[in-house]
């Protein structure tokens, strides 16, 4: 089963990914935790460039994310899924649509086509959208990378993008209230993941 975590800056994706992986392992499931950008040697190099390097044009940024994704799917995600592991990925194609499409203003249909090319058509079975107002998420976040330093209106556009994506695919993208303590959010996530997991993956 392929699960992705999505959301704006400071929503707690990294924490929730770790808590979900721990829960899955306790329940006896083999799982792989990975992230975008990143997840491979090329991906980690691109991550440094994308998040901490000199400013890029929106198109160059988009193409680097696509290169990262193509390598990531081929070397990490698809092989893990092929042997029956649960894959939990911090960001995937929805982030590209939200950030480069809604945030940067690039053409959404062209981004979808590029995503399809990079992934070979692979889509998550479940996407957990951690929903938190941009103002709250930015106040929480301390990393200070290039995305977090964008102006508030950019993050509001990204947020509206995630809202639109969730509205368009309600069966795949499930809104999770990201307010409250990490354990409270983790409980909300597990209440969504557990029935989907039991339906998709045989009990170990």
From Swiss-Prot:
<dbReference type="InterPro" id="IPR018094">
    <property type="entry name" value="Thymidylate_kinase"/>
</dbReference>
<dbReference type="GO" id="GO:0005829">
    <property type="term" value="C:cytosol"/>
</dbReference>
<dbReference type="GO" id="GO:0005524">
    <property type="term" value="F:ATP binding"/>
</dbReference>
<keyword id="KW-0067">ATP-binding</keyword>
<protein>
    <recommendedName>
        <fullName>Thymidylate kinase</fullName>
        <ecNumber>2.7.4.9</ecNumber>
    </recommendedName>
</protein>
<dbReference type="GO" id="GO:0006227">
    <property type="term" value="P:dUDP biosynthetic process"/>
</dbReference>
<dbReference type="InterPro" id="IPR039430">
    <property type="entry name" value="Thymidylate_kin-like_dom"/>
</dbReference>
<keyword id="KW-0547">Nucleotide-binding</keyword>
<keyword id="KW-0808">Transferase</keyword>
<dbReference type="InterPro" id="IPR018095">
    <property type="entry name" value="Thymidylate_kin_CS"/>
</dbReference>
<keyword id="KW-0418">Kinase</keyword>
<dbReference type="Pfam" id="PF02223">
    <property type="entry name" value="Thymidylate_kin"/>
</dbReference>
<dbReference type="InterPro" id="IPR027417">
    <property type="entry name" value="P-loop_NTPase"/>
</dbReference>
<dbReference type="GO" id="GO:0004798">
    <property type="term" value="F:dTMP kinase activity"/>
</dbReference>
<dbReference type="GO" id="GO:0006233">
    <property type="term" value="P:dTDP biosynthetic process"/>
</dbReference>
<feature type="binding site">
    <location>
        <begin position="7"/>
        <end position="14"/>
    </location>
    <ligand>
        <name>ATP</name>
    </ligand>
</feature>
<dbReference type="GO" id="GO:0006235">
    <property type="term" value="P:dTTP biosynthetic process"/>
</dbReference>
<comment type="similarity">
    <text>Belongs to the thymidylate kinase family.</text>
</comment>
<keyword id="KW-0545">Nucleotide biosynthesis</keyword>
<comment type="function">
    <text>Phosphorylation of dTMP to form dTDP in both de novo and salvage pathways of dTTP synthesis.</text>
</comment>
């Amino acid at each position: 089963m392929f699960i992705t975590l999505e959301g704006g800056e400071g929503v707690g994706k990294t924490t929730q990914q770790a808590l979900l992986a721990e829960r899955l392992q306790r329940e006896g499931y083999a799982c792989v935790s990975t992230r975008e950008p990143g997840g491979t040697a090329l991906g980690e190099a691109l991550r440094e460039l994308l998040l901490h390097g000199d400013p890029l044009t929106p198109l160059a940024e988009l193409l680097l994310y696509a290169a990262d994704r193509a390598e990531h799917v081929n070397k990490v995600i698809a092989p893990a899924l092929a042997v029956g592991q649960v894959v939990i990925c911090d960001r995937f194609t929805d982030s590209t649509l939200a950030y480069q499409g809604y945030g940067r203003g690039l053409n959404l249909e062209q981004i979808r086509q590029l995503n399809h090319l990079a992934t070979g058509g692979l889509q998550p079975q479940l996407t957990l959208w951690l929903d938190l107002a941009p103002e709250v998420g930015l106040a929480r976040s301390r990393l200070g990378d290039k995305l977090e330093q964008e102006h508030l209106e950019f993050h509001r556009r990204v947020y509206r993008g995630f809202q639109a994506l969730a509205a368009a695919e309600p069966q795949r993208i499930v809104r999770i209230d990201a307010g409250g303590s990490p354990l409270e959010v983790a409980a909300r996530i597990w209440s969504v993941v557990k029935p989907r997991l039991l339906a998709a993956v045989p009990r170990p």
